[in-house]
Amino acid sequence: MEDDIAALVVDNGSGMCKAGFAGDDAPRAVFPSIVGRPRHQGVMVGMGQKDSYVGDEAQSKRGILTLKYPIEHGIVTNWDDMEKIWHHTFYNELRVAPEEHPVLLTEAPLNPKANREKMTQIMFETFNTPAMYVAIQAVLSLYASGRTTGIVMDSGDGVTHTVPIYEGYALPHAILRLDLAGRDLTDYLMKILTERGYSFTTTAEREIVRDIKEKLCYVALDFEQEMATAASSSSLEKSYELPDGQVITIGNERFRCPEALFQPSFLGMESCGIHETTYNSIMKCDVDIRKDLYANTVLSGGTTMYPGIADRMQKEITALAPSTMKIKIIAPPERKYSVWIGGSILASLSTFQQMWISKQEYDESGPSIVHRKCF
């Protein structure tokens, strides 16, 4: 497909927005899903201060701004800010006119009906797109792995879902949601680093901790054993240089932080860990398809990028499942972007072209058309 008529694929996550053209193998634009507004009144005349900043620009000016995330736990909560993010995506990042391209958007599993209608309305009425479609994130991740049946454990910055999918259809009764994801792990790492005597408190410092988490954390295969190793030797210690040149050392925090995914009690939460949530999701499905789900457990999203997570998942699910069951955890290397990649694949299929909701259909039926055409 040529860029001039290619569909646009926009995956709006709680933490990052991924956008690009259908048919590409990676998103062209990846930026933080944040809108920043100045904390103080501007004093310099002619500075051309804006009343809001989006994405990387908001991130770089974070010292003078109040940062807001319009997507919380995977679901849009602030539509005015969301519109700003979409505007920024089309005009500043991709530099396209949205009225010339079909747009594929993604949504969280179990997204409220009113939300998808609102998305549809904004696309057609504010941005005048010729056609659009809304796809469920986890289903796209599964497509990206070349499957149509499996269970996806999708964990991003704001929310974690386990979504069983059979022959391309998500099974809503078996989808489970866990409000524990990347942002919570960053906050937890801030807390345990504070116990070490390092102080991280502001929203700007939180970004530094997020970087430490992404560069140094990993999942232990056996937590207790790893704790013992960390206590008896310094082999697990790593150092990290802060922006001001100070060097900090981090030891057992490296695996204590993501361990919270398996033991949410670390964060004071009473929910099950990701392994148990995945198992519970499978158990809510028909007994005949469970075998296919166990053998096709796909990890997706940035919070599944920790080294060691697939082996640990394999070990934990094997312990829960029937002893003869074949269990396979699929962790594609590009899983950070697999939702976007799945969208790119879907939107460029010739068989998909009749699935778009056109402007004409929208004008005839209104926003509720989205429930009839996107499932």
Swiss-Prot record:
Superkingdom per UniProt: Eukaryota
Catalytic activity: ATP + H2O = ADP + phosphate + H(+)
GO molecular function: ATP binding; hydrolase activity
Keyword GTP-binding belongs to the record: no
EC number(s) stated in the UniProt entry for this protein: 3.6.4.-
Keywords: Acetylation, ATP-binding, Cytoplasm, Cytoskeleton, Hydrolase, Methylation, Nucleotide-binding, Nucleus, Oxidation
Mod. after translation: Oxidation of Met-44 and Met-47 by MICALs (mical1, mical2 or mical3) to form methionine sulfoxide promotes actin filament depolymerization. Mical1 and mical2 produce the (R)-S-oxide form. The (R)-S-oxide form is reverted by msrb1 and msrb2, which promote actin repolymerization.
Positions where Methionine (R)-sulfoxide occurs in the chain: 44, 47
Subunit structure, interactors included: Polymerization of globular actin (G-actin) leads to a structural filament (F-actin) in the form of a two-stranded helix. Each actin can bind to 4 others.
Note, other: In vertebrates 3 main groups of actin isoforms, alpha, beta and gamma have been identified. The alpha actins are found in muscle tissues and are a major constituent of the contractile apparatus. The beta and gamma actins coexist in most cell types as components of the cytoskeleton and as mediators of internal cell motility.
Annotated family: Belongs to the actin family.
Name of the protein this chain belongs to: Actin, cytoplasmic 1
Species whose genome carries this gene: Xenopus laevis (African clawed frog)
Source taxonomy: Eukaryota, Metazoa, Chordata, Craniata, Vertebrata
